[in-house]
């Protein structure tokens, strides 16, 4: 495990596990874990931006990002009523559909196109009208609070990053986010945080830090760490592109021999 507090070098998995030479595109799968509002999605966004992928047509992207929130299980009417009052624990492992998460990541690793619903935080439900289509890519970022919690899912990752941000900063980010973007009121946000979010982080999320290959203190503010990770991913993409070009040349040469 590497803690990137004052990092100027970075030793990361080299992507050998991702089959660049296979005809089917098997991506390099990166897990990005961390507490609520730690900056996981922002880290993924910055990685995408620096690699020139954010504005690219989604059918052509070499790097894609997926949120674990899309794998919350459907709530019962009683659970939805609790959720509206901030009384449902969305930070507990049982809140997620582990099997769907696992099968979807397996299909992605097999190079299949998959469709993933978005999550509507205002209604606490999956939005199947707004489906994210994930096309085969070279690198896939999968971010969420508990992406390292489930053993069989954790084993799928070629690289594991943990975004480590102090609890005061995370709470300061979560309150305005949940009020402005998710339609919550202050009392509900604070009740949910103290009752569920904080205890669940300490019990389920924080212990998974030990599984990380790299810890990123201060999240997206740690530009040095992000630059090093971007450089490493760039090397993986370059290797993949080189292998694909080599395969194309070999196929072309083979065709020429058959023609003669």
Curated annotation (Swiss-Prot):
NCBIfam families: PRK05480.1. This is Uridine-cytidine kinase. It catalyses: uridine + ATP = UMP + ADP + H(+); cytidine + ATP = CMP + ADP + H(+). GO terms for biological process: CTP salvage; UMP salvage. GO terms for cellular component: cytoplasm. InterPro entries: P-loop_NTPase, PRK/URK, Uridine_kinase-like. Keywords: ATP-binding, Kinase, Nucleotide-binding, Transferase. PANTHER family: URIDINE KINASE. Pathway: Pyrimidine metabolism; CTP biosynthesis via salvage pathway; CTP from cytidine: step 1/3; Pyrimidine metabolism; UMP biosynthesis via salvage pathway; UMP from uridine: step 1/1. Substrate binds at residues 91, 119, 174, 184, 192. Disulfide bonds: none annotated. GO terms for molecular function: ATP binding; cytidine kinase activity; uridine kinase activity. Belongs to the uridine kinase family. It is an enzyme of class 2 (transferase). ATP binds at residues 34-42, 221. (Microbial infection) Required for optimal replication of E.chaffeensis in the immune tissues, hemocytes, and fat body. It comes from the Eukaryota. Disruption phenotype: (Microbial infection) After infection with E.chaffeensis, results in reduced bacterial replication rate and increased survival. RNAi-mediated knockdown in the whole organism, in the fat body or hemocytes results in a similar phenotype to the genetic knockout. However, knockdown in the eye, salivary gland or wing has no effect. Its EC number is 2.7.1.48. Pfam families: PRK (PF00485). The gene is Uck.
